[in-house]
């Protein structure tokens, strides 16, 4: 079943990438910012209050084509505004934590991320905020968490041993997790988890004992399986995060024009 899924994924990616291979598709649009700090903790990805701790609070709501029914949660983008008087050429990096439901902008940033697009001169960030909505360029970039491994967080709704809900934290690379399989440690009997909403995956068929995971991710133009052999102990608890022991570093190729692989500085 896993092999069949990977083959189907590779076919879909191949036919959806008819343009030249590219790591950094460049997009032009507009960005606004959240005027209320409370909105940052209620994003559709269901990260809750943890969202404000990602990338020093540089987070964003993205349009549906980026959010992708939740598979875009945790994706990283480099974004810069285009006002030559106020904006730096480097911009800032944000992580997707929410769905942008408006059609006025591609991204809605936290005010901290919005200000970080400004030039490093006194008052530039304040003047940028006054603009409200600005023209931007943005591109997908790998999420870099240094030496930190990916974490599996057990949601508060989980009930050992009958129901398990998880979300992935600190997912590196430039990929999307499109499927998750779960099995008892040492077993070859895998069952699939279902994406419930946002970044949350669930199952009511929880194997007994300690648990291992297989994550199917986009990588290059194909699907790749990342195996985390021992993640959750038999006595796993709701509300706790567990080290997955692995990190994703792959880059999923895109097909687009224009492509921008230059360093922004």
Curated annotation (Swiss-Prot):
Give every Expansin-like CBD domain span: 162-244
Q: Which GO terms describe its cellular component?
A: extracellular region
Give the PROSITE patterns listed for this entry: EXPANSIN_CBD, EXPANSIN_EG45
Which GO biological process entries does UniProt record here? Answer: anatomical structure morphogenesis; plant-type cell wall loosening; sexual reproduction
- At which residues is glycosylation annotated? 100, 103
Q: Which Pfam families does the UniProt entry name for this protein?
A: DPBB_1 (PF03330), Expansin_C (PF01357)
Source organism's superkingdom? Answer: Eukaryota
Q: What is its main location?
A: secreted
CDD domains (alphabetical): DPBB_EXLA_N
What transmembrane ranges does the database entry give? none
Give the Expansin-like EG45 domain ranges. Answer: 42-148
Record-given protein name? Expansin-like A2
